[in-house]
Amino acid sequence: MKIIEKILSENLSIDNDTFIFDIETTGLNPRFCKIILIGILYNCQDKTIIKQFFAENENDEKELLTNFIEEIYHFKNHITFNGLAFDIGFINYRLKKHNIDFNLNKEDDFDIFKFVKLFKQSLNLKSCSLTSVEKYFGIYREDIINGEKSIKLYENFVKTQDKNIMDIILLHNYEDVYNLSKLINIKDLVKEKLDLLYISNENYNLSIFPVNYKINAKKLTMNYFIFSGEHNNISIYNDNYSIICEDDNISLEININKGIDRENNTILFYSLSKIIPLKFNDQVLEKNIYSLCNFLKKNELHNI
């Protein structure tokens, strides 16, 4: 097993109790596949360090994991890209497989992929892949391979021990963790691209953005992400709707009505000073949905 360490010439803005990590594996299923490379980035004594743990063959996995744990056990938090769905679960399974008494906690993770996915449509992103997100925010990389290509290259490396192949795999992983460090402030980066809604009174000042909604025959639910401001977990209950503020989310639930017009069209609507149609047969009237939700939310929260 090889450990490759590099001290960056720049000191990146990352909390001392937090590290970034990314893994490379021989496949997607941790039951049958192994971890062959873990890259981490962290700050130590005013220096930013990238360290990579590389398995020269698949039998090095346990040693790789042991060295990884020894390096990161004292950190409180971690940052990943799709780590909640892949990296964390994969590592934990392989740790258990090798009887290593350690577990990465998903609650300690900030998953940049999960956050960006909330705003995929609003940002007009075709894909939420790391390379797509990087390009969107003007971050470019040297490496030209993806995870699938990395698997095939590693198979060749194990057979040949060709250093050039190893360097290609290492560069791919290196740029994954390094570029994630450029996305640590992803909330601010996304915030600059959106037309936020602002709600303020003498008690608080919130900046929010609608991320998704659901509508059925009885209820319309709209969720907002809170970019800034404190709200003390506000809860508002009305005969026709409720507003729940919890952590960085505002959930608005509205009771709606269903009717049929003279031409047998099915209409979902809400009655305010006038009837506001929200869905006409299969056509969702998004403009009306957003206007209604924003009006109710802003009106209620502003008056608290």
Explain the meaning of each model-derived region.
Residues 38-40:
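Short beta-strand scaffold segments in enzyme catalytic cores
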